[in-house]
């Protein structure tokens, strides 16, 4: 059984036991979160696709960690004009383990 869920502007195909990294969620470490924006659910009987979400479906996940990704360097310059700007950015993330898929 798997589900396709949306969170943080991205879509994830998950099964029970999967570990995923999503955009930062406002949750404490070791707490559980319910993700209700489930776009599709598939099991032995077939696939159920929502319009836009599957009614009554939810995915329960446990928060393993909160952190920041590796630094991305943004470097802008204009040739021959002595214009240089260097910026760094670290995107926050939440590490989840999928515990249960309900459809």
Curated annotation (Swiss-Prot):
This is Large ribosomal subunit protein bL21. GO terms for biological process: translation. PANTHER family: 50S RIBOSOMAL PROTEIN L21 (PTHR21349), LARGE RIBOSOMAL SUBUNIT PROTEIN BL21M (PTHR21349:SF0). Keywords: Ribonucleoprotein, Ribosomal protein, RNA-binding, rRNA-binding. The gene is rplU. It comes from Clostridium botulinum (strain Eklund 17B / Type B). It holds the Pfam family Ribosomal_L21p. One of its GO terms (cellular component) is ribosome. GO terms for molecular function: rRNA binding; structural constituent of ribosome. Part of the 50S ribosomal subunit. Contacts protein L20. HAMAP family: Ribosomal_bL21.
């Amino acid at each position: 059984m798997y589900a396709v869920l949306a969170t943080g502007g991205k879509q994830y195909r998950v099964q029970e036991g999967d570990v995923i990294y999503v955009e930062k969620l406002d949750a404490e470490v070791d707490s559980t979160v319910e993700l209700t924006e489930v776009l599709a659910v598939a099991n032995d009987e077939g696939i159920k696709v929502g319009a836009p979400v599957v009614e009554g479906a939810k995915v329960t996940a446990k928060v393993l960690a909160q952190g920041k990704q590796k630094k991305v360097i943004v470097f802008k310059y204009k040739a021959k004009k002595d214009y240089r700007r260097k910026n760094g950015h670290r995107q926050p993330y939440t590490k989840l383990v999928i515990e249960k898929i309900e459809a």
